[in-house]
Amino acid sequence: MSNYVIEKTLNNNVIICTDENQHHEVVLIGKGIGFNKKKGMELSDSVMIDKVYKLEQKKDQDHYKALVEIADDNVLQTIIEAMDIITHADRTVVDKDLMVALTDHILFAYKRIKQHQFIKNPFLIETKQLYSESYQIAVSVIEHLNKLLDIEFPEDEIGFIALHIASSKDDLSLHEVRLTNEIINKSILIMEHDLKYKIDTNSIQYQRFIRHIQFLIRRLQKGEIIQVNDEFGNMLKAHYPLCYNIAVKIIKMMQQHLDVEVYEAELIYLTLHINHFTQQNEKNTNV
């Protein structure tokens, strides 16, 4: 049985407490749970508690406390409700990891937007394609924020929030998620420069390509090695030298980012994916 000491009552349905047994900062959600509750009051396990968000790490607790101190109660409540939207939509989301990151991001994004300061999301297209489920959840979150906070979060913010969600559910750090997006973005720029045409980011070829890059990065980070038939590899290099040279450039760029060795087989498979773009472009040109 948990005993909680109330730190802050946001409204009748949301309170921030300390779990006396485990010494964790927690957010409690429940209908009427905050009614007539004051700071310092004790609260035992109750049927009124519908949801508990735990902050286990000391640094997360300190960070969250600092955010709570500077946040408007209405904004904080709306962020907690956004967390509820996310965890109801996807049960694989690790809420203890996401709570602080989401609060921090939305709180400062809200302040920026109120001051008409906007940040461009350079990886919006990649995020939408790679993490489509997280992106759709983020759309619901932004709609909720816009409605309750009477503000207009831009589409770029949907992408940022989707990254936080994807990072939590896929057990990846936000740095890893952003690195993957950056590598994909640079790969597309290399292809567009050398192929001399714009890549259709709505095409099946694009979706397959970014998935290939995503799993290629994971293989490289894990040190996994794939094999390819030498005859097949030599044939691709001979028939599609431009695609092969583009693949070499992309692999060199990836090596700089990941500091790993990349074997010939990966070059061959990447060449194959790049060739799919050229074939589709030829079809579109001849229509």
Curated annotation (Swiss-Prot):
Gene3D superfamilies, alphabetized: 1.20.58.1950, 1.20.890.100, CAT RNA-binding domain, PRD domain
PTM annotation (Phosphohistidine): residues: H105
Entry's Gene Ontology molecular function annotations: RNA binding
Keywords: Activator, Phosphoprotein, Repeat, RNA-binding, Transcription, Transcription regulation
PTM notes: Phosphorylated by HPr, which enhances dimer formation and leads to activation.
Pfam families in alphabetical order: CAT_RBD, PRD
Native organism: Staphylococcus carnosus (strain TM300)
Subunit annotation: Homodimer.
GO biological process assignments: positive regulation of DNA-templated transcription
Disulfide cysteine pairs (residue numbers): none
Transcription regulation as UniProt keyword: yes
Name the record gives this protein: GlcA/glcB genes antiterminator
Occurrences of domain PRD (ranges): 67-175, 176-284
